[in-house]
Design a protein with these regions (language model features):
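Helix-coil boundary/capping segments in enzymes
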Residues: 1-228
């Protein structure tokens, strides 16, 4: 607990990776692998993050996460999907299967540590009807507190086809968190210039956020869904 008992320090941007979701997106993984030299990496689709062993980090080690939260004076975290596993561009059924497993695992950890964690739900955004059903299941039955999607999927953020989903999220009365897509990586703008100097994070994400906000405002989403 923070020193001021009247307030809490809340971390709203805290990604997590679950063992229960490994290989739940079919051939797209995700999975933790090792190459012939024993170097551990994280694979999703044809992309490899190397070296990366999530099992030895706060992404997967809950005890380590809780220790770090205590060390930094963080009282509560909103846990959210790893943006590498948004899977907004894979076949819909694979995304549906993955998101269901992701949200079930999220609900379980929140239930076990309800004083420390809230959970955000992943959606198979490429299938609007399935996304509405999963959002309702995640909030009404699993007790998750927010909806979490990327900024780059098969249609524009202001496409009217998304209006039923936006209406459903507004009706559920939970926040919609839109995380910038992995610019320069799978499902994001492919600009090789971003690869230099780690500009994917420095400039690419800011670019994605700017485009997303422009589409939400100038595309009329906020006007059509004032309670979103």
């Amino acid at each position: 607990m923070s020193s001021d008992e009247s307030s809490k320090v809340i971390d709203l941007h805290a990604h997590i990776v679950f063992q229960e979701t490994m290989n739940r997106a079919g051939s797209f993984g995700p999975e933790v692998c090792a190459d012939n030299d024993g170097i551990v990496f994280f694979r999703f689709g044809g992309y490899q993050m190397k070296p990366m062993d999530y099992s030895k980090t706060i992404f997967m080690d809950v005890a380590m996460r809780l220790e770090e939260m205590h060390r930094h004076g963080i009282d509560l975290q909103l846990l959210s999907p790893n943006p590498l596993t948004f899977f907004h561009h894979i076949p819909a059924q694979d995304a549906i299967n993955f998101c269901a497993a992701q949200n079930d695992a999220m609900a379980n950890i929140v239930l076990k540590h309800s004083d420390k964690f809230l959970g955000a739900a992943a959606l198979p955004i490429q299938d609007i009807d399935a996304s509405i059903k999963e959002a309702e299941r995640a909030v009404k039955h699993l007790g998750l507190s927010a909806i979490y999607i990327g900024t780059n999927f098969p249609f524009d953020i202001d496409d009217p086809c998304l209006d039923p989903l936006y209406s459903a999220i507004a009706e559920l009365n939970v926040p919609l968190f839109m995380h910038p897509a992995s610019s320069g990586g799978p499902g994001g703008p492919d600009d090789s210039r971003l690869a230099r100097f780690d500009m994917t994070l420095i400039l690419g994400y800011a670019y994605e956020e700017t485009v997303a906000v422009a589409q939400l405002v100038l595309g009329g989403v906020i006007d059509r869904h004032p309670n979103l």
